[in-house]
Amino acid sequence: MSIPLGTAQALKLWHDVSLAQVHGHEADLSVRQVTILLTIYMEAPPHTIRELAKKLKVSKPVITRALDSMGKLDLVSRRRDVADRRNVLVQRTVKGALYLDRLADLIGMNSKNL
């Protein structure tokens, strides 16, 4: 059962989670990068750069730049689609899954303080 949060509570939760991430040793991801990561993990594959760009309403180069940074951190991987070589598939990694697990834990722990 979920409990609706007021505006101040929602912002406090976001602030507290953000502070915990900054104080921790997690990768410093932008909101766009976290959104991409959540999309890859919460929605059924396959995920292409084209599809992610459409979903986030940004250009393909914007997605590519975000994925470049995330790939260096091993949070996602990319490979050519063998069925359609024009497409690049964006895939999950163990490190990306662990990042989101820790983020979910931070949200859960900080939501208890509201």
List PLM regions with ranges.
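Amphipathic alpha-helical dimerization/coiled-coil segments
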Residues: V17-Q21, D101-L114
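Basic, amphipathic "hinge/linker" alpha-helix immediately C-terminal to the N-terminal HTH DNA-binding motif
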Residues: A83-D101
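N-terminal helix-turn-helix DNA-binding core of bacterial DNA-binding proteins
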Residues: L19-S59
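Canonical helix-turn-helix DNA-binding module
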Residues: P46-V88
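Intrinsically disordered, low-complexity regulatory regions
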Residues: S2-G6, V94, S111-L114
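N-terminal leader segment of winged-helix/HTH proteins
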Residues: M1-A27
